[in-house]
């Protein structure tokens, strides 16, 4: 059973899943596959692959970062809820907000949260560029993004939402270091400073991952993020 595999792998890292948490992951998988038949949530649907490449991959940052306590976490472009929903299951005190530009994914997440009995979660249908200019600007302890765009672009979408003293966690595949060199200029302009990078392998040769931890040192200039689409079309790079 894939849930037993996940439980065993997390136990090796000192994380013990309760029966309730195991049931939540099992329901999560079931709902993901059901809803995926009517909307494109993920290309990964094999049970073991979901447990490895979505659930385990989402939780792995917690091997290097402390998510305990009532921290506020905003997840940008989480799709079907990765990494924030698996993290919320393992760390129930987290206060999670997911911002996604596709309303159908928000509908799935609302249904998922109700079925899993998750509290202190909210799902916002919005563009990150607009959300980052609103009332929740510079209000989150942690902002996460998992491989949704290059780091230069992600920094402009995510750092404006991180409060001073908080952190942006960029979760990347093996090209993270290369992207980091390109993004250093943008990170600095946006008030951030790279703290550290953790590189690790997923089990079963499923690929290399990198977590880049960026401290929010200063407030972000009010001109960022720029209007929707601009960060992607014209990334902040040194001229």
From Swiss-Prot:
Pfam families: GidB. Signal peptide: none annotated. It comes from Staphylococcus epidermidis (strain ATCC 35984 / DSM 28319 / BCRC 17069 / CCUG 31568 / BM 3577 / RP62A). CDD domains: AdoMet_MTases. The keyword Acetylation does not apply. GO terms for cellular component: cytosol. Its EC number is 2.1.1.-. One of its GO terms (molecular function) is rRNA (guanine-N7-)-methyltransferase activity. PANTHER family: S-ADENOSYL-L-METHIONINE-DEPENDENT METHYLTRANSFERASES SUPERFAMILY PROTEIN. Coiled coil: none annotated. Residues 216-239 are annotated as: Disordered. S-adenosyl-L-methionine binds at residues 77, 82, 128-129, 146. InterPro entries: rRNA_ssu_MeTfrase_G, SAM-dependent_MTases_sf. The keyword Cell division does not apply. Belongs to the methyltransferase superfamily. RNA methyltransferase RsmG family. It is found in: Cytoplasm. This is Ribosomal RNA small subunit methyltransferase G. Specifically methylates the N7 position of guanine in position 535 of 16S rRNA. Keywords: Cytoplasm, Methyltransferase, rRNA processing, S-adenosyl-L-methionine, Transferase.
């Amino acid at each position: 059973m894939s849930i037993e595999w996940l439980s065993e792998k997390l136990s090796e890292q000192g994380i013990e899943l309760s029966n309730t948490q195991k049931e939540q992951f099992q329901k999560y998988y079931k709902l993901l596959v059901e809803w995926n038949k009517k909307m494109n949530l993920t290309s990964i649907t094999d049970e073991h692959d979901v447990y490895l490449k979505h659930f385990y991959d989402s939780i792995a940052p917690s091997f290097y970062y402390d998510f305990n306590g009532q921290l506020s976490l905003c997840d940008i472009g989480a799709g079907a809820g990765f990494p924030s929903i698996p993290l919320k299951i393992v760390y129930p005190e987290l206060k999670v907000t997911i911002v996604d530009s596709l309303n159908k994914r928000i509908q799935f997440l609302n249904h998922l949260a109700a079925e899993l009995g998750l509290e202190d979660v909210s799902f916002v249908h919005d563009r990150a560029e607009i959300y980052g200019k609103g009332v929740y600007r510079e209000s989150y302890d942690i902002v996460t993004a998992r491989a949704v765009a290059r780091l230069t672009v992600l920094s402009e979408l995510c750092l404006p939402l991180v409060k001073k003293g908080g952190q942006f966690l960029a979760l990347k595949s093996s090209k993270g270091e290369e992207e980091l060199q390109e993004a250093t200029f943008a990170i600095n302009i946006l008030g951030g400073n790279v703290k550290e990078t953790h590189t690790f392998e997923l089990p079963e040769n499923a690929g290399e991952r990198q977590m880049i931890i960026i401290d929010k040192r200063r407030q972000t200039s009010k001109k960022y993020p720029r209007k929707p689409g601009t960060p992607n079309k014209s990334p902040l790079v040194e001229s």
